[in-house]
């Protein structure tokens, strides 16, 4: 919520400045990047100062080099997940690669799509994303409702199916003739879906993390969320360079969500996923 709220405030600021001073798209982009640079520098400094000092949880084995030990540890963790957590965690991390790639690219490609296909100005694109960010709030409430009626696995898959459907709708229906109101409605629906997608994803992960591996798997979580983030934009770029309509490119990148849904569908039923994690926790507690 803090992340989406900060993005919304920044968008409102830039829309106000652009409209107030009558800037064109180039000037708006220049000013926004300048503000970004200042804000990021301040946030980095503040975060660095406030970051607590924590003792190392592992020591470097004799004869091992720090440069390579991290890779060795990651490989060992990956093998442990494959061996001990086949029912849920393995499928979650695999699905995460494609799910995050889809969600991240959706917002990136939307800028190109709105400009090239819809003919939106920079201010209109800002309004589009402001609407999307506002709608993440009811999306989060909807996520809580759906997840309470089902489970995180089912809820997360449903959010990705809806996201894919929105991609297909936008790619096939939206154009200059449909007008901006329909595009804004589409943006609102995308915002609701992303507001449903992200908290459900994090809830899913938090409920299946094995005891004692929280810090290490948090790194795995970030790694999996970024490892193929480059692929959907590349697919979109290849299609556009081949003179394929941008709408079909939007549909293509949305298809990565279906891969994530298929992977999650291979996981065990939700009670078995939880039992798999709880069983490992109980074993570790007994050994302690």
Model feature map: region roles:
Residues 1, 122-123, 211-221:
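Loop-to-transmembrane helix entry/capping segments in MFS-fold secondary transporters
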Residues 1-97, 101-105, 259-288:
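Intracellular loop-helix junctions on the cytosolic face of multi-pass helical membrane proteins
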Residues 108-124:
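Short amphipathic helix-loop junctions that connect adjacent transmembrane helices
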Residues 127-136, 190, 225:
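Transmembrane alpha-helical segments of major facilitator superfamily
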Residues 138-154, 240:
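Helix-to-loop junctions at the C-terminal end of transmembrane segments
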Residues 162-177:
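C-terminal ends and interior cores of transmembrane alpha-helices
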Residues 180-197:
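Hydrophobic core of transmembrane alpha-helices in multi-pass small-molecule transporters
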Residues 196-210:
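Intracellular juxtamembrane helix-capping segments at the cytosolic ends
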């Amino acid at each position: 919520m803090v992340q989406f709220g900060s993005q919304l405030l920044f968008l409102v600021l830039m829309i106000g400045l652009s409209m107030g001073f009558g800037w064109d798209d180039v000037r708006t982009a220049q000013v926004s990047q300048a503000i970004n640079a200042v804000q990021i520098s301040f946030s980095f400094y503040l975060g660095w100062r406030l970051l607590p000092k924590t003792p190392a949880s592992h020591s470097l084995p004799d004869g091992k080099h720090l440069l390579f030990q991290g890779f060795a540890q990651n490989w060992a963790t990956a093998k442990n997940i494959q061996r001990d957590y086949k029912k849920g965690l393995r499928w979650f991390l695999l699905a995460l690669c494609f799910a995050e790639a889809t969600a991240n690219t959706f917002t990136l490609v939307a800028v190109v799509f709105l400009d090239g296909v819809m003919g939106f100005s920079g201010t209109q694109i800002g309004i589009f994303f402001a609407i999307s960010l506002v709608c993440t709030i009811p999306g989060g409430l909807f996520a809580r409702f759906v997840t309470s009626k089902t489970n995180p696995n089912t809820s997360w898959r449903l959010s990705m199916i809806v996201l894919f459907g929105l991609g297909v709708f936008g790619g096939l229906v939206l154009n200059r003739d449909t007008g901006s109101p329909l595009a804004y409605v589409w943006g609102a629906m995308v915002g609701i879906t992303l507001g449903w997608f992200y908290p459900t994803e994090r809830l899913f992960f938090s409920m299946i993390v094995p005891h004692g591996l929280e810090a290490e798997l948090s790194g795995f979580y970030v790694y999996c969320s970024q490892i193929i983030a480059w692929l959907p934009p590349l697919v979109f770029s290849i299609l556009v360079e081949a003179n394929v309509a941008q709408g079909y490119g939007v549909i293509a990148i949305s298809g990565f969500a279906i891969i994530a849904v298929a992977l999650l569908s291979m996981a065990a039923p939700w009670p078995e996923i939880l039992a798999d994690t709880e069983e490992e926790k109980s074993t570790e507690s007994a050994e302690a």
